[in-house]
């Protein structure tokens, strides 16, 4: 990709038209002009009175390297010869009020390590990728009809060195990737890696959208990390925040002394919940900045997906007492998704949206926002509220566990057990569970069993896989020493077996987005808090029966209606002794009894374990048996309507 000479740029291409390669115009680019090697600096500052480039090379003297205004709308540019890579710099901006302010480059691809805030000249074009095989394999499979397990993590607190310092991108490739492969996760989702000044913002309050944070190394180091992930078959999803940004003095806020990237109207500019300001998504230059940024991460870092943060905050104005939709944001999100899928039709665009906004994952040509996945926040909130309730009272909120099936096919959903639910006093997943020590582990195993058998792709935050007891501490690493304790080892073994079972069981993912893939057996047993259902694959014989018991009671000879196969085997029981359970399992092959039950033509009698999930698989189809009514009903699949764009 060549750097475009700013003096040749038609102003309409950036100021009034869709222009998604703005990173080729703006920023600091190492070039040769008039046979001299140096750096061309270009920036947009529409209300600046004067602009300069400052750095160690001119002792930060803003009188030395004055920039030239090349468009009336405020593009400034300057070529400085003999500057080399790794020079640090900022823009000195004389405002209309006569003040001089110093700003980092909005398009810088590298920055100083915090607490320093200058931008760094860096040639990002030289990395040699080795992931062609990954790209080919990705195109051969449709994620909609495949298993998808996402490991969400915070790069700075997954694991730290003995002296408390951070692992680099390259070191994390050596530490993290084998762990992810061992657990059979298909993707990792990393909390924001854009440059940000404050560690405890977790990256959600950025200053450098084009700069991979230097906390962990150079852009090439991050490219190496992604390359290694692809080598081992792991997709990489990044958290991305196009809705708001931080107010630190060196960043985008009041960039030229006036609202530039943010709304001018204070009522909609400020975001009081986070202490940030909202991007002006109605401004063409801002849209080009953000959409170019998304494509930049795709093209230069080979990212496989974005989890778009705080979509609800974008969709609605945050004026007090108002629920009015923000049409700027709606049209921006549609434009963003159209641009992303034009670049890569296999990309993952996931909306973190807690509202009931319709058609989030429908294509824009059907009136949708154009994402292909959405976090199921409703499922997460309902299920965790149910699990935190004392078991004897769960029967009174039975609908918390069934309500999601009324809407689960309205969108393409990911089920998130995310970082938001294990921080700020909310407790870890394990510690949310009521009861004594044994009860907590049993119920977490039960929760995971329900999680992996409910329709929708899966996402788990780091530490959940071995039952982290304390909630997430963002300045510390995970409690890896918990592996010294037997119950945590049992939990870890159970989770690995459960995820392996999920991946090899087509009924648990093949029809995730089709009503054909799920059928209740009994959704109404609130008195015993027992739920049973069928997960179905493309073929009739690809079926699993799932029974979940959310109380501590054990039931012998419990009748469960099942599709008419001759035998069933129990392929997983969360109460097995090897997982730390009491051993109430069904070891023998279960022969079906030819008596109707639960609206099925046959049933089996099983032992229901305390706080347990039991998964049954048919062994042999009864000769001459008829297909169960409703087991393969013809319903328009969301995969067809939302999968292709």
From Swiss-Prot:
| An example Gene Ontology CC term for this record | cytosol
* UniProt GO MF annotations: 1,4-alpha-glucan branching enzyme activity; cation binding; hydrolase activity, hydrolyzing O-glycosyl compounds
Compositional bias of kind Polar residues: 636-645
Q: Which reaction does it catalyse?
A: Transfers a segment of a (1->4)-alpha-D-glucan chain to a primary hydroxy group in a similar glucan chain
Give the Enzyme Commission number: 2.4.1.18
- Record's keyword terms, sorted: Carbohydrate metabolism, Glycogen biosynthesis, Glycogen metabolism, Glycosyltransferase, Transferase
Give the GO biological process terms.
Answer: glycogen biosynthetic process
> Which Pfam family, giving just one, matches this sequence?
Alpha-amylase_C
Positions annotated as active site in the UniProt record? 309 (nucleophile), 352 (proton donor)
Q: In which pathway does it act?
A: Glycan biosynthesis; glycogen biosynthesis
Q: Which InterPro entries match?
A: A-amylase/branching_C, Branching_enzy, GlgB, GlgB_N_E_set_prok, Glyco_hydro_13_cat_dom, Glyco_hydro_13_N, Glyco_hydro_b, Glycoside_hydrolase_SF
Instruction: For the region Disordered, give the residue spans.
Output: 619-645
Under Gene3D superfamilies, the record lists: Glycosidases, Golgi alpha-mannosidase II, Immunoglobulins
Please report which protein family the annotation says this sequence is part of: Belongs to the glycosyl hydrolase 13 family. GlgB subfamily.
State how it assembles: Monomer.
Q: Which HAMAP family match?
A: GlgB
Which function does this protein serve? Catalyzes the formation of the alpha-1,6-glucosidic linkages in glycogen by scission of a 1,4-alpha-linked oligosaccharide from growing alpha-1,4-glucan chains and the subsequent attachment of the oligosaccharide to the alpha-1,6 position.
What is this protein's record name? 1,4-alpha-glucan branching enzyme GlgB
Identify the species of origin: Bacillus cereus (strain 03BB102)
